[in-house]
A protein has these predicted regions:
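Conserved beta-strand signature within the Rossmann-like core of class I S-adenosyl-L-methionine
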Residues: 112-120, 306-313
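Class I S-adenosylmethionine-dependent transferase superfamily signal
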Residues: 105-106, 131, 225, 299, ...
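Conserved SAM/SAH cofactor-binding pocket of Class I
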Residues: 1-64, 194-281
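Active-site capping/gating segments
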Residues: 134-167, 173, 321-348
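Short beta->alpha hinge that forms the Motif I/post-I loop of the SAM-binding pocket
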Residues: 48, 97, 120, 239-244, ...
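A short glycine-rich, Lys/Arg-flanked "PGG" loop and its adjoining helix->strand segment in the class I
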Residues: 99-111, 295-305
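Short SAM/SAH-binding signature in class I
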Residues: 82-89, 276-282, 310
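SAM-dependent Rossmann-like transferase core, predominantly class I methyltransferases
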Residues: 2-3, 145-210
């Protein structure tokens, strides 16, 4: 969103504090805060993910401006006190998440407040439809190389809250099927991830094992792994997303996970070393990312002696050097078009 400040300039006169910047990438958010030039107490930046929250704070410091930065599972966890909600909508966000943010943003607007979407698309017909559906009317700026802005006024109190959640079932082998709730903006939305299935089908989990679901998303992997570990086993779910963690707790409870622990953290804080028999990782496919490095390097010291580390990927050549550097050795199991890398237990 490199033209966000130019796009915002076309609608800046409509903005009244206090302002909420709803999600959005760190640099566009920071540039908006700087452009607004409001007192720190008049601007709140909300994110769903602790890692993104940290990045927003770092970026605000880099551009030498300040705002309140909060992490929430849902925008409507905030009070309905804002006169303007700004949604810097990146092209990468999926339609369901965009709809979710617009609907939840309406709930935190005061009556008479303005909802403003900044889209980086030169021609965008999606937000006009979304905002008309929610607010009744929607104005827009002309199409331009800077993108388009869409603006709507909240004319009455919001109705009932509506979640854009999708339920699905999954099972591994002869295990019992489980039902999972998924929501936009979390891993494995709408269906059980094929890579996770490929990994669990070849994972060795014994009764009584202590399992870590690393980057758990909605908790489906941890719940299915916990069933394999049995009632004497233990599952720890960890994710940097508050929205994902809320879902993991919901799904674990619904599927009878009685010996479960839930950790919201960005860098595996709160996990004791040498405590896990099995660690399961399904990192983002941009394999050289900071998250993937953390998933690999941070896992080694968490394993018990003889513990097993599994990572599923479609790009094994991209992660193998880092896994070799971290664990010293590994093997690869091919399943369903995915490569499941096993490390930690080699030679044990």
């Amino acid at each position: 969103m490199k033209h966000i400040t130019e796009l915002f300039a076309t609608v800046a006169h409509r903005v009244k504090p206090p302002v909420l910047i709803a999600v959005g990438p760190p640099w566009p958010v920071a540039n908006l805060v700087k452009t607004l030039a409001l007192p720190e107490t008049d601007v709140t930046c909300a994110q769903f993910d602790l890692h993104q929250t940290d990045r927003v704070r770092e970026t605000l410091a880099e551009v030498e401006t300040k705002a309140e930065v909060v992490t929430v599972a849902d925008l409507w966890d905030l009070p309905p006190r804002f006169n303007t909600v700004i949604f810097p909508a990146s092209a990468q966000a999926d339609r369901e998440l965009k709809l979710d943010i617009v609907e939840q943003g309406a709930h935190v607007l005061a009556v008479g407040g303005l909802f403003l979407t900044l889209s980086e698309y030169e021609r965008d017909s999606q937000f006009a439809k979304l905002q008309k559906k929610i607010f009744g009317k929607c104005g827009e700026t002309p199409s331009s190389e800077n993108g388009m802005a869409f603006f709507s006024t909240k004319t009455e109190e919001s109705g009932a809250r509506r979640r854009h959640e999708v339920k699905y079932h999954a099972k591994i082998g002869a295990g019992a099927p489980m039902e999972f709730v998924s929501r936009p903006g979390t891993f494995s939305y709408g269906r059980f991830d094929a890579g996770s299935r490929a990994m669990l089908e070849v994972t060795e989990i014994n009764p009584g094992d202590s399992v870590l679901d690393l980057g758990c998303g909605n908790g489906a992997v941890g719940c299915l792994a916990g069933a394999m570990a049995g009632p004497e086993g233990r599952v720890t779910f960890i994710d940097s997303s508050l929205r994902a963690m809320a879902l993991a707790e919901l799904n674990a409870k619904a599927n009878g996970a009685t010996n479960a622990r839930f950790v919201n953290a960005t860098r595996l804080q709160g996990l004791e070393g040498g405590t896990f028999d099995v660690i399961l990782a399904n990192p983002p496919y941009y394999a050289k990312s900071e998250i993937t490095r953390l998933f690999i390097e941070g896992a080694r010291d968490l394993l018990k002696p003889g513990g097993r580390y599994y990572l599923v990927t479609k790009m094994p050549t991209a992660v193998m050097p880092l896994i070799f550097d971290t664990f010293g050795d590994c093997s690869v199991i091919e399943n369903r078009g995915y490569s499941v890398v096993l490390a930690g237990a080699i030679g044990a």
